[in-house]
């Protein structure tokens, strides 16, 4: 059986990472461990629960980044008018 940190049955007890990159790296590690098929059932369920939480963190961070880009871009995000390019 795998005895790595990824398969730790206490993964649900650890605090969630607050940054996208750390959450994504942990999520990828959990997915890899589950895909190997060597985790016992309880550890697989624990890893799956943790993975769902990490996926939510990633989705939230991406949504926040998208909102920041929209705010920064403001009116610049509009369809391209080819006729306007001809006038220049």
Swiss-Prot record:
It catalyses: Exonucleolytic cleavage in either 5'- to 3'- or 3'- to 5'-direction to yield nucleoside 5'-phosphates. GO terms for molecular function: exodeoxyribonuclease VII activity. Coiled coil: none annotated. The keyword Iron does not apply. Its EC number is 3.1.11.6. InterPro entries: Exonuc_VII_S (IPR003761), Exonuc_VII_ssu_sf (IPR037004). Belongs to the XseB family. PANTHER family: EXODEOXYRIBONUCLEASE 7 SMALL SUBUNIT (PTHR34137:SF1). This is Exodeoxyribonuclease 7 small subunit.
